[in-house]
């Protein structure tokens, strides 16, 4: 699993933990729902998102950005 896949899994995990939809996160961040779906995709590629995007999403999820780079949680 590469770093992009780790971040993707963690964003999805914390989003669901907070009871948010991809549309909710998109609205909170100003990103399109399609962009959020692409970031959460298990097939996310290099340059699929920026550190700035991860930071903005971490604010929307109210999660420390470091947690999004940890080993993915189960769930």
Where are these regions (language model features)?
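Recognition helix of helix-turn-helix/homeodomain-like DNA-binding domains
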Residues: 30-47
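Short, basic-rich loop-to-helix N-cap that marks the start of a DNA-contacting helix
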Residues: 44-59
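Conserved hydrophobic/aromatic packing and binding residues within compact polymer-binding modules
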Residues: 11, 25, 36-39, 68
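Short C-terminal boundary/hinge segments that cap the last helix of small helical domains
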Residues: 62-75
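Short basic helix-loop element that most often maps to the first helix and adjoining turn
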Residues: 10-28
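Helix-turn-helix DNA-binding elements, focusing on the entry/boundary residues of the two helices
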Residues: 11, 22, 33, 51-54
